Amino acid sequence: KIGMKVPGIIYINEEILKYMEGDSSFEQVANVATLPGIELASIAMPDIHWGYGFPIGGVAAFDIDYGVIVPGGIGYDINCGVRLINSNLRKEEVLKVRDKLSTELFNNIPVGVGTKGKIKLTEKNFKELICRGAEYMVDAGFGIKEDLNFIEENGRLKDASFEYVGAKAIERGLPEVGTLGAGNHFLEVQEVSEIYDEQLASKFKLREGYITILI
């Protein structure tokens, strides 16, 4: 595409390609490659699909002096990341109750666009949640203190401020506390089927044959 400053690199196989006919996400990869200060390449991972500006699954790095910051490039759920929860359950134990577990997860975790969470907060509580992060949820009984040791920044950004959170954002965010979301948001019950690095796995307390939950 005219104006591309770097190449586009897309990590997919033939099987994924079949499902992408008519999808404009390839064009979005090219569009990202035209942005000022982009470095090396406009990259897309295997979960690529159409987004707001960037494709979902898009990755781009920009020069700190000449690049751009695009908060709404993919969407508005900034800091949408992935968290792995370890467990002491073996695969055999979970398989016995697989159907029941699946039903309970769906019954207790609201999913989809426009769903409302079961955790009810006042605006004052919501403000505290935004400023204190996971620490607030632990104090509210939704986790244990040890959990915080395994979360980036201990689950709380020290400089977090409620000052610039507008009324519309509060209105949208309050009912969504405790929901999973939609699109490419997911919850998977997984098995550690193979260990590739014993030392690293030991640090994360990952054991072969045991169950983890990826959110």
Regions found by a protein language model. Name each.
Residues 41-61, 182-188, 193:
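N-terminal entry segment of metal-dependent catalytic domains or homologous docking segments
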Residues 45-59, 68-84, 211-215:
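Conserved phosphate/anionic-ligand binding catalytic regions in large, soluble enzymes, centered on
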Residues 1-39, 68-72, 78-208:
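Glycine-rich, flexible loop motifs
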Residues 64-65:
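Secondary-structure transition/capping motifs at alpha-helix termini
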